[in-house]
Amino acid sequence: MKDPDPSQVYRPDMDPEAAKDKGSFRNYTSGPLLDRVFRTYKLMHTWQTVDFVRKKHAQFGGFSYKRMTVLEAVDMLDGLVDESDPDVDFPNSFHAFQTAEGIRKAHPDKDWFHLVGLLHDLGKVLVLAGEPQWAVVGDTFPVGCRPQASVVFCDSTFQDNPDLQDPVYSTELGMYQPHCGLENALMSWGHDEYMYQMMKFNKFSLPGEAFYIIRFHSFYPWHTGGDYRQLCNEQDLAMLPWVQEFNKFDLYTKGSDMPDVDELRPYYQGLIDKYCPGVLCW
């Protein structure tokens, strides 16, 4: 039996009445943005292959794209609207502060967790570097094995993916061993994996939970759909509650009320100075 959908179980700890109706988030069957969202996932599920992901690791693994601070990266996201997101049609920089502030109110004693809220989508600067959105945004999934049922648009978007014609990659386990651990899975390329690798490269001093949340927060088929358990080890199951806790704020703090970014910047600059100071390699 699959785990229950966190969107039906979890609720934000702050101002639940002010949030959008929970059942209306992540609606992939109707809504004004649906055509845009479907096109993005169709491209993603056609072209995200083992070979493609390995090439992207090689292309961006040297972190020579740009040198900038964390808040400069946040400011860059003013120019990005995520075309895979059915919930919002405003710049990602606002979502970064919304998520961070939601976590801060619910977990005032965990300053590293507040910073994760700000950092979690900064890998989307790849779009502003010229990468197509289907190679940056949206839900992630392991390549090298058959996509499982809870992947968004699973039944209607993978028909042209060449890996599904491969006798190994088209099986449930694919190129993996049972319970190999998600750290050993090759995830579809996007802002999660890029940001995780960037944080390691720049030696962020955040706890392991922060790195894990960043790397797998878009892996909805796992943390929400309950799929891909055949790849999980004990560490993954131990970390799952952290990812699900983060997901409450990633999802349910989206709204039209824009935070006062200028008022918030000094607090988050202090966290950046503590955990990831200075000019960083992106």
UniProtKB/Swiss-Prot annotation:
Disulfide bonds: none annotated. This is Inositol oxygenase. GO terms for biological process: inositol catabolic process; renal system process. Its cofactor is Fe cation. Keywords: Cytoplasm, Iron, Metal-binding, Oxidoreductase, Phosphoprotein. Substrate binds at R26, D82, E83, S84, K124, G138, D139, H217, S218. PANTHER family: INOSITOL OXYGENASE (PTHR12588:SF0), MYOINOSITOL OXYGENASE (PTHR12588). Its main location: cytoplasm. Pathway: Polyol metabolism; myo-inositol degradation into D-glucuronate; D-glucuronate from myo-inositol: step 1/1. It catalyses: myo-inositol + O2 = D-glucuronate + H2O + H(+).
